[in-house]
Every structure is written in structure tokens, then in C-alpha cells.
A protein has these predicted regions:
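Extracellular loop and loop/strand-boundary signature of outer-membrane beta-barrel proteins
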Residues: 29-31, 76-78, 115-121, 156-162
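Transmembrane beta-strands of outer-membrane beta-barrel proteins
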Residues: 17-21, 60-68, 103-109, 144-148, ...
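Short glycine/proline- and aromatic-enriched beta-strand/turn motifs that initiate or cap beta-hairpins
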Residues: 5-50, 162, 167-180
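Short loop/turn motifs that connect adjacent beta-strands in outer-membrane beta-barrel proteins
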Residues: 7-16, 50-62, 96-102, 138-144, ...
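Transmembrane beta-strands of outer-membrane beta-barrel pores
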Residues: 23-29, 47, 68-74, 109-115, ...
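Gram-negative (and chloroplast) outer-membrane scaffold detector with strong preference
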Residues: 41-115
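Residues that define the transmembrane beta-barrel architecture of outer-membrane proteins
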Residues: 15-17, 35-41, 80-87, 101, ...
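Membrane-embedded beta-strands of outer-membrane beta-barrel proteins
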Residues: 43, 89-91, 131-133, 148, ...
Length: 180
């Protein structure tokens, strides 16, 4: 498909791979600890493991992905915590490509290790779960992604109390899809 940027990538295809560098940030929402901001940045590797399934607008491909998160910054009222994370559980539904757009839904989960308790008075070991809606904008060699992500951080009862942090984030990334 010819575009102003040249030919667009094919996007997510069965047997393909994704690599991406991303960064995101957001603020806490009701349902957990308030007055907290989050910034995180990471690297993703994904495997597109199915061909196209489902009818109509639901048609798409399933991708499994992992994220290394070397930069977590949690801005809390009492301090700023720095941490790292690993998300080994990334389930992504890549909807059928529409022109240069490749929309997706994602569910993911992992761990967060920080230098201060997150939230304050809880624990330095936490678990993360997230749901995201986004799209890839496919270019000739690379793609940009933009998404809205709901992120939940909790110690899962490792410490008391366990108020958790709920945030809505905007995440952007640059990456590439390819087939071996």
C-alpha cells in the first residue's frame, strides 16, 4: 500500500515477531491510592502465534508478548519510588489491519520491584495487571503505537494494608514487525 511514508509494513502476521521500545505515564484514578503518578518505560518482544480468526470487525490475530521494564517511577505524596519490572504475561489481540492502522486490545501482568514501599506503608514487591486499547500506525520500516492503558499495582496481600494503585496511562512506542 503506497503512502506518504512509502510502503507500509504488513503489520502483525502469523509467525511474525514484534520488537518495540515504549514509554507511558498517567495518574491515579478512584479505587485505590490517590494523588499518585506513574511513569514507566520498557522493551517488548512479541510472537504473533495465529493467523486471522473471527468474523467482521473482530477479525484478528493473537500475539503473546513479554516486556522488560527497566524504568518505573512512582510519584507518591510521601516520596518518589524507583523500580524495575518484568511482564511475562502479555496477551494481545491484533485486529485486522485497516490501511496503515493496526488496532489492538491487550491484557498483561507482571511484577514491580521498587526502592520504596508502593504504595507508602505497604511493600517493595508488587504485581501489575493491565488492560489496553491502542493502534499501531504502520510505516515503511517502523511503526508507532499509541494506547490508553488501565494499570493496577498491588502487593496481592504480601503486606497489610494492600490499597493498590489504579492508573489510566497514555503509552507511546516505536517498533517493528517482521517475519523470519
Amino acid at each position: 500500500m503506497a503512502t506518504g511514508l512509502g510502503l507500509a509494513q504488513d503489520g502483525p502476521e502469523e509467525g511474525g515477531h514484534e520488537v518495540q521500545v515504549w514509554a507511558g505515564g498517567g495518574h491515579s484514578v478512584p479505587g485505590g491510592t490517590s494523588r499518585t503518578g506513574i511513569f514507566d518505560a520498557g522493551l517488548r518482544y512479541g510472537w504473533v502465534i495465529t493467523g486471522a480468526h473471527l468474523p467482521g470487525i473482530l477479525r484478528g490475530r493473537f500475539e503473546y508478548a513479554v516486556d522488560a521494564v527497566p524504568a518505573y517511577v512512582i510519584f507518591q505524596p510521601s516520596n518518589t519510588a524507583y523500580g524495575v519490572g518484568f511482564n511475562p504475561f502479555g496477551l494481545k489481540w491484533n485486529f485486522e489491519r485497516r490501511g496503515r492502522l493496526s488496532p489492538y486490545l491487550e491484557l498483561s501482568g507482571g511484577t514491580l520491584f521498587s526502592d520504596h514501599n508502593v504504595p507508602t506503608y505497604t511493600n517493595t514487591v508488587n504485581f501489575t495487571s493491565a488492560a489496553a486499547l491502542g493502534t499501531h500506525v504502520l510505516g515503511a520500516k517502523y511503526n508507532w503505537s499509541v494506547e490508553v492503558r488501565y494499570l493496577h499495582i498491588s502487593n496481592a496481600g504480601l503486606a497489610t494494608p494492600n490499597p493498590g494503585i489504579n492508573t489510566v496511562q497514555v503509552r507511546v512506542g516505536v517498533g517493528r514487525f517482521w517475519k523470519k
